[in-house]
Amino acid sequence: MVNRAHLARSAALLALAAAAISCRSINAPAGVDREMAASIPADTLILGGVKLDELRASPLYPKLPPAARALAEPLRDARYLLLASNGKDIVAIARGRFREAPPGATLVAPGLAVTGSPGSVRAAIAQYKTGRNGAPDLLARAASLADGRQIWMVARGGVPLPVTGNAANLNRLLRDTEYAGIAVRLGSGIEIEATAVGRTAEAGREFEENLRAILSLTAAASARQPDVVALIRSIQIRREDRTVRASLSGGAAAADRLLRLVPR
């Protein structure tokens, strides 16, 4: 006969193991742990992530704009960076090998630092104290998009992005979306994947048409820059019901051309 006490102990151990796995489990991009997720303010509308360790190891890292590398320098001991915005303020949440808080940052927990405006830092710390994921839907959206990519961003639909100039066309494009996201992989070449989900199938169709129109106009306006035109024409666009995906990939030469387009 099986010892009942032994069965009870086994059941208790299984329950504890399941609870431990549940506590560690989080629907988020690889590298984002529960403490990082709990530091995302609850009013976050736009969320981005950077796998700093992998980005620094990329052959293309030295070719990034100086401003981008200067942003990462104070976080040289960080391995992962989250950037959360409510449309007004941005807070950076960094996980790394911090013995003390990086310059201008606040250490929330061992190896976890936040920096930003005073209000955004207070919001991140207050959310951390609740122990709850501040943006579970955005992290879940990012989970598959960010797979194998060093840089990613997701945004709730209809949220104005903090962009100006020609980039402001993005806000008109995203007005009727439920959510949108983009991810970048830098290796010997570059891969970019963008996704947008319309509020309805009709909104998805209009998004695709508007995106194609914007790209056509941009190509026409760049006629004297054949490299740029070639890049634009290489973008692949496909739609499935409400979801529109656009992708671009190329080798080192394409990556160089794209990086030259980034403001210095």
Where are these regions (language model features)?
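Soluble, non-membrane globular domain cores that form compact, hydrophobic packing
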Residues: C23-R264
